[in-house]
Amino acid sequence: MVTITGCALCDALVILATLIVAAYLYYAVRFTYWKRKGVVNPKPLPVFGNFLPSVLQKRSPGQILWDIYKAAEAPFVGFYIFARPAILIKDPNIIKHVLVKDFNAFSDRHASAAESDTLGSQNLFTLNGAPWKYLRVKLSPTFTSGRMKKMYPLVESCAKQLQDYLKENCNTKAIEVKETTAKYATDVISTCAFGIESNSLKDPNAEFREFGRKIFEFTRYRTFEVMALFFSPGLVKFLNGNFFTKETTEFLRKVFWDTINFRESNKISRDDFMDLLIQLKNKGTIDNEDGEVTEKVDKIDKDSHLFEFTGDNLVSQPALFFTAGFETNATTLSFTLYELSLQPDLQNRLRSEIAGVMKTSNGKPTYEDVFGMPYLHMVVSETLRKYPPLPLLDRVCLQDYKVPGTDLIIERDTPVFIALLGLHRDPQYYPNPERYDPERFSEENKRQRKAYTYLPFGEGPHNCIGLRFGYMAVKTALVHMLAEFEVKPCKDTPIPLELSTRSSVLATTSGIPLTFVKSTAQVS
């Protein structure tokens, strides 16, 4: 046997020392990438770059990007996802170029799922390139205002069930609004996306709610897995990372096809998302009945081979709707109720607006009524500023790109991020940013605000396709809750809130118990 020193132990020590030196030199060179480009960056750590706090689950990925945002007064900041260089864009003018003006250079997202995750990898959130574009165009008629108006009765029915739930429980105990709003959001998504009445508010063991919990149950491993899905495609492949577990996939698949088969056998139509998916399955397109301008479909059918509306490709669409919809709607609702409980003057002003609409509509507000309340929109907008459900936007640079007004060239394949917590809580754009103030979104203040500093739904061709639905679900619930109840903090309400260091979406470490009292100013 050939040895280096004639001593096995000494050989092992030499090899170990060589590996340590090689690793040190690799990281020493690798971690000078941004310095060599003249880009400011927080000091990275060997192996982990700037993501050790996320690996240790002391800071969520969104909070890490917030920390990086605050690390330097610069239009952009370099950082390292383990050993991979990435860049955080801070300047609103550059953000505009990334999201809109130069979209073709940044049209792909960085988030990814393993190919074996047949539901998680075949939707608008994770698809890139021509398949994403084709799917986006085909789905765009789903979320027009006309379609939302047709789905409104389904959402309103869930809001009335939420109102009934509060009536039954308001006088006995404080209500945990995180769980209550999650049940409401689950009922809304299950009825609109899957055509199933899950009855989560009535049944504590409802299947849809149980699977929703599992998706967002952030164990130590799940936290690391989701972090990889957003930030490290290499780790996703190594871990075989999934948005949906095998159990969840089988559940959603069964619900979907059972519903499809029942409707087609019995010729049932319900004006929901499932009806539109049946159109896609049978015709390859969705009728744009209300005539609203959507993504252009001309010349897109030549790419139909890139994405077929069959099998799990179909199931993945309501699966994403379920995942992206229920948690974001629930957190927006719970944060809004929390802030209104702490500021009764804001709550009373909103209740007064709701009471006026209830009076003119004889207690039956329409879709137009809900979307026609200016102060309600200001309140929800301020919640989305302070608590953006997904606290980051992610892109990948698809070609060497010279940043306008600078000498920096972002190299191809570089991950590009926008920190919404940083942007939305930057005192330069929002004075006293920790203060919850809906007046920031008055028409006058909106006109004065710098563009591209408010991005809860993203912007440009990659913006959230379901934003109208999200607004409808949240606003309808608030109208029916505050029409009859005052919401107040109780002795167990956490003040201030502590944000979770594990969750990929913005969430609190604990529950949010609040007290609901029948309003003396109710109008029905």
Swiss-Prot record:
It comes from the Eukaryota. Its cofactor is heme. One of its GO terms (molecular function) is oxidoreductase activity, acting on paired donors, with incorporation or reduction of molecular oxygen. Its EC number is 1.14.-.-. Keywords: Endoplasmic reticulum, Heme, Iron, Membrane, Metal-binding, Microsome, Monooxygenase, Oxidoreductase. It is found in: Endoplasmic reticulum membrane; Microsome membrane. It is a peripheral membrane protein. This is Cytochrome P450 6k1. It comes from Blattella germanica.
